[in-house]
């Protein structure tokens, strides 16, 4: 098992995990535009066996299996034993298991299946620096990748979160909860967060950007990189001439 299962591509600063919450999304052609996929078992209510097997065959990137608890923004209200019963049937079809800090006792079982672990914690508040550092260390103690989502209350909190992310010595996915400071989601990737989570049809967390929106942001914020989605389009990161040319064309078209 490798701890860099979600290692970021150095050619693009923002990489995208599409969070899938329905069979419809598992079968969507849009999944091919994501760098990695998250299967939200706590939100999916239909049978997914066939769809997940098909997705595993067709999708080449990492796949994450998640059962998010209701205490951390998900729909799972059961205990530790029930969590493993939900995970076990599908663990062979994915590369990574997301384990919340409350379920860290399952880490040895995940390791026995030779899967990487995203050790996660989601809080609707902004911890102080000491709390954040202690949380990072605890998550790292059982996970290959640390994942933290918190809720900044001020712009200063956002700046502090960027600094903590940049200074983290471990592989980390840092995110924010809520809509007020949702712009921090792509920015955190510029400061060392491996990935940002997006949706295809339905948000799995308030404040998420859609996959298409994040593709645009990834293009604009990764200097010198042209996402395949933009092939054939005139705009390149750092070059605004295409915008001006297109705007002039529109103005002429609208003249009466």
Swiss-Prot record:
Record-listed 3-dehydroquinate binding positions: 19, 38-40, 68, 185, 204, 208
Protein's pathway: Metabolic intermediate biosynthesis; chorismate biosynthesis; chorismate from D-erythrose 4-phosphate and phosphoenolpyruvate: step 3/7
Enzyme class, spelled out: lyase
Catalytic reaction equation(s): 3-dehydroquinate = 3-dehydroshikimate + H2O
GO annotation (BP), single: aromatic amino acid family biosynthetic process
InterPro entries (UniProt xref): Aldolase_TIM, DHquinase_I, Type-I_3-dehydroquinase
Keyword set, alphabetical order: Amino-acid biosynthesis, Aromatic amino acid biosynthesis, Lyase, Schiff base
EC number: 4.2.1.10
UniProt-listed Gene3D superfamilies: Aldolase class I
Residues annotated as the enzyme's active site: 122 (proton donor/acceptor), 147 (schiff-base intermediate with substrate)
Family, similarity comment: Belongs to the type-I 3-dehydroquinase family.
Summary of the function given for this chain in its UniProt record: Involved in the third step of the chorismate pathway, which leads to the biosynthesis of aromatic amino acids. Catalyzes the cis-dehydration of 3-dehydroquinate (DHQ) and introduces the first double bond of the aromatic ring to yield 3-dehydroshikimate.
Name of the protein in question: 3-dehydroquinate dehydratase
Organism for this UniProt entry: Methanospirillum hungatei JF-1 (strain ATCC 27890 / DSM 864 / NBRC 100397 / JF-1)
Gene name linked to the record: aroD
């Amino acid at each position: 098992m490798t701890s860099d299962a979600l290692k970021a591509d150095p050619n693009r600063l923002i990489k995208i995990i599409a969070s899938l919450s329905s069979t419809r999304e598992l079968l969507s052609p849009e999944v091919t535009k994501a760098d990695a996929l998250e299967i939200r078992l706590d939100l999916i209510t239909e049978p997914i066996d066939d769809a997940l097997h098909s997705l595993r065959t067709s999708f080449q990137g990492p796949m994450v299996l998640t059962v998010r608890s209701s205490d951390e923004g998900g729909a799972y209200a059961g205990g530790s034993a029930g969590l493993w019963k939900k995970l076990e049937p599908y663990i062979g079809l994915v590369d990574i298991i997301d384990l919340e800090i409350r379920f860290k006792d399952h880490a040895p079982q995940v390791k026995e299946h030779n899967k990487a672990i995203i050790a996660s914690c989601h809080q609707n508040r902004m911890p102080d620096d000491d709390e954040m550092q202690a949380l990072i260390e605890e998550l790292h103690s059982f996970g290959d990748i640390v994942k933290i989502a918190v809720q900044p209350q001020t712009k200063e909190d956002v700046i502090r979160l960027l600094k903590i992310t940049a200074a983290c010595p471990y592989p980390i996915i840092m995110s924010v909860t809520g809509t007020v400071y949702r712009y921090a989601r792509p920015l955190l990737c510029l400061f060392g967060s491996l990935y940002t989570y997006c949706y295809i049809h339905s948000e799995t967390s308030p404040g998420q950007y859609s996959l298409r929106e994040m593709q645009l942001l990834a293009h604009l914020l990764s200097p010198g990189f042209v996402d395949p989605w933009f092939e054939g389009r005139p705009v390149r990161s750092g070059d605004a001439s295409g915008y001006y040319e297109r705007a002039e064309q529109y103005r002429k078209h609208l003249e009466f």
